[in-house]
Amino acid sequence: MKYPTTWLQGASLGERITCELRLQIIRGMQTPGTVLSENQIATDFGTSRSPVREAMKVLSSEGLIRLERMGAVVIGMTPDEMEELFDVRMLIEHFVVQRYVHKDNTILVTTLNQMIDKMEVALKHRDIAEFSLQDFNFHEALVLEAGHTRILHTWNGMRQLILTVMLAATEQRFASNIEESQVTIHKHRTFANALKQGNDQELSRLIEEHYRDTRNAVNDSVLSSYRKT
């Protein structure tokens, strides 16, 4: 699976290369220890080396590769690093939801339910990219609603990594256990209902449950390639 072209509208060539390489690394197509050649990547994408260097800098800042004189060495994401990503996401969602759980969230809940509706349509049509995107949009909407500048800055620093992990995990889930995606939809709907009711304890429980289940799903799919190396 390639990075969805519909997600790349308006992106520079360097950003396109970054997104494709990030997905290859997360999916295990570029395994840890692999040396990425600027010349080969430039040839593969039909471009000069300048956009490739741009992509390498971004991937290095995300900790997915290590820049060396001989080239860029793939690091990937270890199970511990994936755990840390989920830890940060869970902490952020816990915090932001508590900021507005007792307010009138009618508009937000309506928006969340519209995203869930789109997830249901995507599941019906086996549309991996759309399902992943709407799942991501659901969680991002929770963060944006808080209007917390520093948390938003943190989120933006890892949003592409999160989106790519979700895409890779959804691809594996659709292929091996698509029924789990219906469970995901149900849990998102339950979360939206709890937010509508202002049930902060239920929301906290659902967030913890969601990230526990997500960890297990990613360990069974995305990280399996790393355990084999």
Identify the meaning behind each predicted range.
Residues 81, 105-108, 124-131, 147, ...:
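Residue-level recognition of alpha-helical structural elements
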Residues 115-116, 125, 167-229:
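C-terminal all-alpha effector/ligand-binding and dimerization domain
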Residues 93-94, 116-117, 135-139, 185-189:
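Residue-level signal for cytosolic alpha-helical hairpin/rod architecture
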Residues 85, 112, 131, 135, ...:
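Hydrophobic packing residues in well-ordered alpha-helices of helical domains and bundles
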Residues 95-121:
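Amphipathic alpha-helical dimerization/coiled-coil segments
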Residues 88-101, 137-176:
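Hydrophobic, amphipathic alpha-helical faces that serve as interaction scaffolds
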